[in-house]
């Protein structure tokens, strides 16, 4: 790893905390002993005196071949692109026992993440008919929190959105502490909920769907008597239109106005996904003389959490950029915990359908701290009873297999681990 450079952390100006309610909400004063979560406050809250850890997260979706999102729903094992359900335990757990009674060795990715210093996992897709308690329980055992995702499907006007009021209760129950989605409260591993991913890139839903879905979610929580304190984010890309002063300000201006989610502001966090260097993020955005995070917080009074942050290996300076991003983020979060809650490095493993090996030249697929190989660690044989997301007899789940592959470390592995564990 290259020698680390100290980053100057800007101090807040007089307008740094325009909304004192938001600041108080994310600055609690009491910690549950040994639990790392706050008593009576949102799970993201970090107190002024007993400061909970800055979230050092990782984006996690390390499917092996032949996974491809374009045809994942044609299979039982990859249906819904859900990495966290029970049948995926051969990837993230130490072992997996099928309903057939057979036990298979696991790749144990969650343990690897723990050893890297990760304390937050960001997921992308979640099928509410699946069971996820094993994954969530394992995260609790390892001291790792989870950003539980609402897949794009549920926000798309031509897919799940019109039926959202019937679908949302099932999603909420699938985030519960019940073994078969039958709990009465959110699982303790869940630190927050993220809805969708980058609507500006997929062009498949808008800020209007984000707003309406969130309102209906909160109303469903009340009806179901679930807690109404989990923070909610809406991940967006880092593109900037000609009319914007800074990336995604137009999106948030609408999302947070009176007719949308202004009344839920204290429940929200902003979740942009930059690839920019630390200088832009924390010191000088758009030649303004101040960093993006500081100015965005001052503008909206809502804390930020980067749900993706990284640089692909195709860029010649990617290692220096990643190192600066991580060090700058942790330093700024320590200095301004009310503004900046954490980061999720993008990502644990390359996208296997774009980068089946380290030698790939695809920029979108080569962000991983690990690369895939052709070495199969184990072949897992499933039986139909291992799957809960299908409506038999209309779906064939016979002879389904998963072949966890050996992962190899990339240069960013040492950078992330070195910084996260310091």
Predicted feature residues:
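N-terminal secretory signal peptides
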Residues: 1-21
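N-terminal twin-arginine translocation
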Residues: 18-50
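Active-site-adjacent substrate/metal-binding segments within catalytic domains
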Residues: 50-139
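Short, acidic/polar
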Residues: 87-113, 167-175, 245-257, 329
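Aromatic-lined substrate-binding rim segments of carbohydrate-active enzymes
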Residues: 105-157, 211-230
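Active-site groove signature of glycoside hydrolases
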Residues: 171-208, 233-238
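Noncatalytic carbohydrate-binding groove/subsite architecture in carbohydrate-active enzymes
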Residues: 206-322
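Aromatic-rich peripheral "rim/lid" segments of glycoside hydrolase catalytic domains that contact
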Residues: 346-422
